[in-house]
Amino acid sequence: MALAPEWRFARRLIAEAGVSVVFGHSSHHAKAIEWHGAGLILYGCGDFLNDYEGITGYEKYRDDLALLYAITFDASSGRLDKLELVPFQICRFQLIHPPEEDVIWLEHTLDRESRRFGTRVRLFSNGRRLSAEPIANIK
């Protein structure tokens, strides 16, 4: 897979500069996630709250769905431990819990986009949170 310049840059920040998390923004919708070495690259986090309701032409990206990125660090080592994603839906300038089918859509879309970076996105059994972890760590 040929790496885009911004992907190489994000990986270098982790490998050479010791950055723990690269937080991508301005995509207006969630994009792929990559665990790279000891670091985490969030290629696009979308908008947590916006005023785009009613703007047409971008429905396939589901910019009405938002994610809270909950990153846990190990207290003794300071290393990244896990990433959990809490889905929300933006409705009338408020965040609400999305319907189950929208959470499943997020799971499938993020899993598909993140697999090329060696990361798996899965829905927790409670149906309210997603996990993202390196494929190599999944048993």
What kind of feature is each model-predicted range?
Residues Y58-K139:
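A short C-terminal boundary segment appended to hydrolase-like catalytic domains
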